[in-house]
Regions:
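N-terminal glycine-rich phosphate/pyrophosphate-binding loop and immediately adjacent elements
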Residues: 9-146, 150
Length: 151
């Protein structure tokens, strides 16, 4: 049986490929052989939960945003579901980063999306009553159980 891609499995488009088709420009600094100048209204170092969300808000406000990340950009279809490959591609120090005293390993992301890319498997669905409370109390939009179902 042929491997299905993300769109076939989930019925939604890959967010990275969708972003690129909507005008994202991606550059790999490792490909540069000489210095280059990039212009932006805002430069954000790190593309994890904080940097990524901040970039989206600023871009929607009309600012030109430059995201700078140490690791690679991976599309959903780049994931092979192989831990050994993920360690070298997605983690700081091939998942070998340790606390200063060596007592604890630190599983820190090194890719576009940061540690959120590797921690998504420990995310749980927000209870429906919590989503409803947020909607009633804080007038949130787009976060009903049905609207969140694809994610």
């Amino acid at each position: 049986m042929a491997k299905k891609n993300f769109e076939e499995i989930r019925g939604i488009t890959d967010p990275i490929l969708e972003g690129i088709s909507n005008g994202w420009i991606t550059l790999n600094a490792g490909d540069y052989t000489q210095s280059a100048t990039l212009e932006a209204d805002v430069a954000i170092i790190g593309t994890g939960a904080g940097g990524g969300v901040t970039a989206e808000i600023l871009a929607k406000a009309g600012l030109k945003v430059l995201l700078i990340e140490e690791g690679p950009l991976k599309s959903t279809n780049d994931f092979k579901m192989d831990e050994r490959e993920a360690y070298k591609d997605l983690y700081q120090e091939n998942a070998g980063r340790m606390s200063k005293d060596g007592a604890m390993s630190i599983l820190q992301g090194r890719c576009v999306g940061g540690t959120t890319v590797i921690n998504w498997t420990s995310s749980f669905r927000t209870p429906e009553q919590t989503l409803q409370y947020w909607s009633d109390e804080f007038k949130t939009e787009g976060v009903s159980k049905e609207e969140m179902a694809p994610w």
